[in-house]
Amino acid sequence: PLVELTQHKASSECRFDRLAGRGLDTTDELCTFEQNLTDNLSSLGVVFGKMRAPEGAPVALEDYGRRNMVRNVLKDGLLLEQNSGINPFKLGFIGSTDTHSATPGAADEDDYLGHLGRRDAGYRNVQDHFEDNPGGLAVVWAEENSRDAIFEGMRRREAYATSGTRPVVRFFAGFELDPAACEKADFVAHGYAAGVPMG
């Protein structure tokens, strides 16, 4: 399976509360990136600068579901694998804009006009975008630029999420990889044989 790690509503990799000085089962201070501090999407129900639902209030770390954040799910999977030999949480990642305005790939902060199309045209709605962001992008390693090849790459989980930069990266992980693998002519075949494709 693939997880949408970031989109215009928020990111779900991890959460860190700078005021509390701690995170949700993590100590990474960079986990403040594009966060929705509620445990639902009610905070995105802001219309003309006013919150329409009381459920949109921020949720304290101790009340926030730890598996709302993907890093915690991955850690749980590794622990389960260590104890039982099975990891049910082998996930791939994608990012998306989740746009409703027919502008795929428009993830640039400087040009962000919103994601709702006609409703974004009015000047009063600009204040509503303080609760969201331009979103992310999905990067998929595919043998060719065709729908079938892209979906095959997604099935292999050779995909990753980015918040706007567009690097071209293909990488593998594993304990049996040769440190000099990048110098080999068949480094991709070696990656598949000795490791796991990571994007």
Go through each PLM region and give its residues.
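C-terminal functional module detector
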Residues: 2-199
